[in-house]
């Protein structure tokens, strides 16, 4: 069993782009989606993710907070493509830019398609209270805002958000 401790932030500006170490292309969908989670019929999301030439099945506890149970299993690329195309209710595509800052790797997710325009920074920590650098481009924390969870972006894509929601000013 693994515990993922992850924090998510909006960005002030594009200054992070000058520090990009590498960029990956991700395509992901959910076998258990936001409707099942919201109704209480499921206690975990089940995600299929393709990242460049690799693929995983991911199971993540539905509870909120920055620490959640998470399990990742490598799967054949062909299986992932078939699941994404045939079994998922929508797919999210994004570019993930890895930006190292003082020994910490920030993952900047730049969403595509109906979520184009949404850019968030994520980082994984070893403990909930672990210190981390706060570069000038790092904005408001949205770790506890359900609106920003990837599983929600399929049913409620960024292109449908109001100006207040896009600014992170409206409760989720």
Q: What do the PLM-derived regions correspond to, one by one?
A:
Residues 1-172:
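Phosphate-end processing signature that detects enzymes handling 5′-triphosphorylated RNA
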């Amino acid at each position: 069993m693994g515990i993922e401790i992850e924090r998510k932030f909006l960005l002030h500006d594009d200054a992070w782009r000058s520090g990009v170490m590498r960029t990956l292309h991700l395509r992901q969908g959910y076998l258990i989606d936001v409707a099942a989670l919201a109704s209480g019929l499921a206690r975990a999301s089940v995600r299929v993710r393709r990242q460049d030439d690799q693929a995983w099945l991911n199971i993540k506890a539905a509870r909120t907070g920055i620490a959640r149970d998470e399990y990742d299993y490598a799967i054949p690329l062909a299986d992932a493509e078939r699941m994404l195309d045939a079994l998922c209710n929508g797919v999210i595509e994004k570019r993930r830019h890895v930006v190292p800052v003082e020994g910490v790797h920030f993952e900047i997710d730049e969403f595509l398609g109906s979520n184009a325009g949404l850019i968030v920074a994520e980082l994984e920590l070893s403990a909930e209270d672990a210190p981390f650098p706060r570069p000038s481009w790092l904005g408001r924390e949205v770790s506890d805002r359900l609106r920003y969870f990837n599983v929600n972006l399929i049913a409620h894509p960024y292109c449908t958000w109001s100006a207040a929601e896009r600014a992170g000013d409206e409760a989720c």
